C-alpha cells in the first residue's frame, strides 16, 4: 500500500507531460484529377516529311528557301478538360542558324542547308525553344484535333552542295 501514492503520482505526471507535448495541427491535402489531355494518333507518332527534290542552284543566297511542305499532327481523342496545346520541336540545331534543324552529316548529305519548321500561320517555330517562347494553339475539347505545320529548306551557306536531306526532330506537347 505504500507504493500506491507513488504509482498515482507517476500516472498523474505521465498524463500531464503527454498533454504538454501534444500539439493540435492539421494538414489538409487537396488536388484534382482532371480529364486526360490528348493522345497522339498512331499516324502522327513516327512519320516522314518529304521535302522532295530541289536544285542546288535555287539557293543563290543565304536565307533562300524552298516552297513549304505541309505536315500535320493528329491528336485523338482529346479529353473534355483540355483547351489548348503548345507544340515544341527539338533536335540538333544547324551550326549557322540555331533556329533551323541541322541535316544529318553523312557522306552523301547535302550541305549549306537547314530545315525550317513553321506553324499553321507559316511563322517560324524556334527549334529547342523553352515552353515560355511557344504560343498556345486552341483545341476543341472532347474531339480529335489536327495541328497543321510546314517545313522547308533554307540556305545557311552558299554555295549549297547537292546531296541527301535527312534530319530528325522530336515534338513535345504541353496541354492547358
UniProtKB/Swiss-Prot annotation:
One GO cellular component this record assigns the protein to is: pilus
Residues carrying the site annotation Required for stability and transport:
175
Against InterPro entries, the record matches this protein to: Adhesion_dom_fimbrial (IPR000259), Adhesion_dom_fimbrial_sf (IPR036937), Adhesion_dom_sf (IPR008966), Bact_Fimbrial_Adh_Pro (IPR050263)
Q: Does the keyword Signal apply?
A: yes
Q: Cell membrane: present as a keyword of the record?
A: no
What's one Pfam family the UniProt record gives for this protein? Fimbrial
**Subcellular localization, as worded in the UniProt entry:** Fimbrium
Chief place of localization: other
Question: What is one process in the GO biological process aspect for this record?
Answer: cell adhesion
Q: Kindly state which keywords UniProt assigns to this record, in alphabetical order.
A: Disulfide bond, Fimbrium, Signal
The intrachain disulfides are: 38-78
What start and end residues bound the annotated signal peptide?
1-20
Purpose of the protein: Involved in regulation of length and mediation of adhesion of type 1 fimbriae (but not necessary for the production of fimbriae). Involved in the integration of FimH in the fimbriae.
Instruction: Give the similarity note.
Output: Belongs to the fimbrial protein family.
Official protein name in the record: Protein FimF
Q: What is the organism of origin for this protein?
A: Escherichia coli (strain K12)
